[in-house]
Amino acid sequence: MEDHPVREEEDGEEDEGALAKSPLQLTTDDVYDISYVVGRELMALGSDPRVTRLQFKIVRVMEMLETLVNEGSLAVEELRMERDNLKQEVEGLRKAGVSGAQVNLGPDKMVVDLTDPNRPRFTLQELREVLQERNKLKSQLLLVQEELQCYRSGLLPPRETPGGRREKDAVVAMGNGEKEERTIMKKLFSFRSGKHT
């Protein structure tokens, strides 16, 4: 039984160590240790309703702290990986610079390996222009589709076209052409299947 109180003292010392750490050095294990210490101290205060409400708030704060620590750890790991990749790239460039002809490029220049299948094929400005044009065309298509739907449902009257014909007549004419094409297709398929109409 004496072993148990000694263990609690050791836990308390470890947990206080987690509280003494810099926020940037915290790990999720440290957050769990802090949570354990705070929970143990709240239990010692008793079962007052105010303590219970405070306990729920502390749990929420600990969850937020855990999330922040996890995100920070991920960001640090990503930066380490990027640093390692850059070191490898610099080392490769140094070896290539020693073995091949030295090319001195400015800070805004980039060397592109034409044999690399993942090389950039467009500038960022070209991509932006293409995306803007695509978005513009999408919005125009949506407007035309809405207008067509309104004409079909009868919400909008047909407009006069410059040739003096109404658009509805033009739409009907296109519909008739479609029907003729469909009947031709039906005849073709019925002929192939052995049915003659």
From Swiss-Prot:
Localization (cell): Cytoplasm, Cytosol; Cytoplasm, Cytoskeleton, Microtubule organizing center, Centrosome; Cell projection, Cilium
One annotated GO biological process: protein transport from ciliary membrane to plasma membrane
Domain (RH2): residue spans on this chain: 119-184
Record keywords: Cell projection, Cilium, Coiled coil, Cytoplasm, Cytoskeleton, Protein transport, Transport
Ranges where the RH1 domain occurs: 14-96
Tree of life domain: Eukaryota
Signal peptide: none
Coiled-coil features, chain-numbered ranges: 69-153
Ranges of compositional bias, category Acidic residues: 8-17
Subunit record text: Homodimer. Interacts with RAC1. Interacts (via N-terminus) with MYO5A, the interaction is required for its role in dendrite formation. Interacts with RAB8A; interaction is dependent on the phosphorylation of RAB8A on 'Thr-72'. Interacts with RAB10 and RAB12; interaction is dependent on the phosphorylation of 'Thr-73' on RAB10 and 'Ser-105' on RAB12.
Family, similarity comment: Belongs to the RILPL family.
Name recorded for this polypeptide: RILP-like protein 2
Organism: Mus musculus (Mouse)
